[in-house]
Amino acid sequence: MPLNWTISSVNSAQALRWIEILFAVSLVIQTVEYLRMSHATSTQGLWAWPIQRLDIPTAWVRRFLDICFQPFCHQMHLWMRCVSAGILIFIGGSFALIAFLFIGNLLILIRWRGAFNGGSDFLTLVVLTGLLIAYGVGSGVDADLGARAGLWYVCIQSVTSYFMSGTVKLLRPEWRSGRAMIIFLNAAIYGPLPPRHWLSQRFWAVIGSWAFILWECAFPF
C-alpha cells in the first residue's frame, strides 16, 4: 500500500504500514548484529549451541533445534530474515511473511535462552504479535478490523511497558539519585566510563535519570 504522509488523513491501514516499515528497519539492524557475531555462535564460540542445547530437556525438540542451529542453517535463517525485512519495507506484509518472522524470532529467543537485547527483543515480539493479529484477523474477518486490533495490541503493550518501567524507576532511590544511571553505563558494552566522562558526574547522571523517569511515566499521556 502506498503511504499517505498527510497526518490528518491517516487511517488504520496507513498506520500499520508505517509500523511495518519502521519495524523492518529495526529488524535489519538486529539481524546484522547477529550476523556479525557468527564467530561467537560457532561450535568454538562463547555461545556455542552444543553447550546451550543441554538446557533442552525433551529429546525430539533438542534434535529439531540441532538442525535449526547448525551454523549453515542458522546463517541462512538470518539472511532470509534480512530478505523478509526488505520485502516488508518495499512491498508490505502478508500473513505468511509475518508468521515466518514470528516463528524465526521465537527460534532466535531460544538460541539466546531469552532476550539478547532486553527491551528491544521484547518490543520485536510485541510488534510481530500485533502484525500477526492484524493479518490473521484481516485475512479471516475484515482488513480494517485486523489493522485496528493489531495496532491496539502494540499500543497497549508499549504504553504499559514504558509506564511500568518509569514507575519502577521512580520508586527506586538509586534511580532518583542518578546512581543507577552510572552503574548501568559502566556495565554497558562500551563501558566503563572514563573517570572524567561527563555522564559519570552526579549532576548529569541525575538529569539523565529523571529524563528517563519522566519520559516513561508520561508515556500514556
Predicted segments with their positions:
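Alpha-helical membrane-anchoring segments
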Residues: M1-F221
